[in-house]
Amino acid sequence: PLSQDHFGSAFSRYLSNNQVEYGVGFFAPAPSSLAVVHFSDAGQPEYSLYRQGIADRAIDASQQIAALPAQCKLLHLGSLALEPEDAPRIRAVLHAALARQIQLSVDINVRINAVSDVVQYRDFLREVVSLCQFIKASDEDLQLLYPQLSTSDALAALRATAPTALVALT
């Protein structure tokens, strides 16, 4: 869900102004998540991510499944949503979507500094990848997901995890 705070209200207005239906049906009292980006001297982005006690995690699987539109054909998720503590809920939603013939898409966008357990996060992200028909990954994502492998071997490992998926490498 979106938060009742200023960010959640602004995002809700943006969705409404762009004819996007907010299907959850409630706004959470918890705050919006926050990402702060800083650029290093080398011009590389560095992230500070605030993901604990936030609105978008204040939902259960039945509420998320009920919010899927009847005509939904594709469910996209980003890896910031894949906190290992939320794995049972997310797993239930993904399997319910697949049971309804909804295709799954993930931007793996690996951010290991934003999760409670890096090993569980990587394992769960690989599990999610195995369910998806569409996957977006960068070379940096692959190196973070498979730190012991070269980029080409990491891509091969990703392809082996989801052999029929369409993969976009950026």
Predicted features, each with a name:
Residues 1-34:
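A glycine-rich beta-to-alpha transition motif near the start of alpha/beta enzyme domains, typified by
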